[in-house]
Amino acid sequence: MKVLIVGSGGREHAIAWKISQNPKVNKIFAAPGNAYNKVIKNCENINLKTSNDILNFAIKEKVDLTIVGSEELLVDGIVDKFQENNLTIFGPNKEAAMLEGSKAFAKDFMQKYGVKTAKYQSFTDKEKAIKYLDEMSYPVVIKASGLAAGKGVVIAQNRKEAEDTLNDMMTNKVFAAAGDTVVIEEFLDGVEISVLSITDSEVIIPFISAKDHKKISEKETGLNTGGMGVIAPNPYYTKTIEEKFIQNILEPTLKGIKEEKMNFAGIIFFGLMVANGEVYLLEYNMRMGDPETQAVLPLMKSDFLDVINSALNKDLKNIKIDWENKSACCVVIAAGGYPVKYEKGNLISGLEKFDVSNSDNKVFFAGVKEENDKFYTNGGRVLNVVSIQDSLEKAIEAAYKNVKEISFKDSYCRKDIGTLYVPVKD
């Protein structure tokens, strides 16, 4: 079986690693991939980036399954193009991908189907948006509606900050066209929970929960990033919280998908906020999270390819996904200066200490390239160091021990991944 994985980050490395464990898979293509093709058997990088190029390659190579990690290509309609050519692809069609591609569309969908979320208004007119600020209490959340690599959300502490943010997004175009429409919503103070799930548009099966760490600096301070680390499961995801999530968010989401006839097999990533004991939906992502995937997939006992095939065959109602009764900690090692300005091309040392077959201690490649059997930095987030242990405390300790084994010039990681939580009793 030939599998094509679209994307170039640590998420795609984790997907390729998990998929490669299925004996039916004898070839993995990565488009464009990264240096992980050097540590996964029968994996080949293909330098393709556009939907049409990827489609033509899949036709030519008779690819059996394509898995899309990249949100941009999903919003661009890559799934629709594959389906028009009778090719099997896992991911949302263009309409369903708009639940991530447009925050304004997603909020309207939530409101229409009774999904519990923060109060909001969407604007394309900056003057009307500024006027609306007078009605808000602070802090307030301002979001660029379009895709902004996970960095398009600003929490403005006062009216001046809010107006400056609107100017940045709508006039100065700091997020390009993503900021043409903005969503202004009430600020919810609480704990964030990430829940990845899989759907065949008839049922949604949640994966285990996770806790992302978005900010660049300790104690969740500094600039937004794509994510600096993850723990799974999330200690705040109690049985009570899970029940509220299913009743107030998952079930109405599924109802909306059915009524809007968004017929697809893919991932729904629920970005949740628990505030004052209630669960709210902050956002949908319509693909695996990065770096959540790198912590969640190593905890999955079930065969991921079999799970995906069940979704493609609309058979999720007949399966159960099994999970390890363990905890995962993923620490992102980034290039110094990320997420603003950083160097590429620095030699990475210490990777040889990690056996690729060791499922308890893994290193997933993100911004990594290979030349002459040596690995070099090639992005802002460079490596994902993951440890699976019997307890969260042990997983955190082991992950940081492994981080110390790896070095490159100006490497940086947060020192507090997973340590901020307070154990929660249900």
Q: Would you name each region that the model predicts?
A:
Residues 1-95:
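ATP-binding N-terminal substructure of ATP-dependent carboxylate-amine bond-forming enzymes
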Residues 153-293:
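Internal nucleotide-binding/catalytic subdomain
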Residues 4-5, 100-181, 235, 239-251:
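Active-site nucleotide/adenylate-binding loops and adjacent lid/helix of ATP-dependent enzymes
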Residues 38-41, 98-104, 217-218, 360:
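Short, charged, surface-exposed secondary-structure boundary motifs
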Residues 368-372, 376-426:
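Generic C-terminus detector
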Residues 246-268, 285-358, 370-371:
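Active-site "cap" helix and flanking loop/linker of ATP-utilizing ligase/carboxylase catalytic domains
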